[in-house]
Amino acid sequence: SVSDYLRLCREDDEYELLDGVLVRRMAAQLPHEWLFQWMLRLVGGYVEARGLGVVLGSRTPVQITPYRVRLPDLLFVRTARMQILNPQVLAEPPDWVLEIRSAGERASDGVRSESDYRTIGVPEIWMVDLPRQRVRALRLHEGDYAVQEASDGLLRSAAIEGFAARIENLFTEPRPRVSDLLQALLQEATP
């Protein structure tokens, strides 16, 4: 159960609770970590500068059911919903979730994660597939998810007001400097 999960797992443990079973997450490969830290700085910097809420990293447990907990790579919670933040586990859906799939992970793991986030009604889900160099963005609208899959172009967030990312930047090395992208995004957001 979630209470057992919280009792047994320490802050630095990399476990998810899947159908009542503790499952250790694979250590991240460098391409995953580079993209994670780049997106954390980009999305986190944007959200902080605009005062939109909070962006948290991969150590934040999100309760799916009483026997299921996920650790998304990134999540966003709007300022108006900050009361859902709990020191131990998010029992309500965040407003936006980002998951990164690395070469060593099975595609079916991503399908299960996506299904879990859909189950609890996360309004926006970005699934980044590093091996296939594709993004699958899902947006909840009137009880159903609209799905967009792409390898290039501009991906605009519905949950994070004014935020957008060029999909090709997620898959190229070196990536553009976060400070340059933030400056451009913030200028666009200023009326």
Go through each PLM region and give its residues:
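Gly/Pro/Ser/Thr-rich low-complexity, intrinsically disordered segments predominantly at protein N-termini
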Residues: 1-191
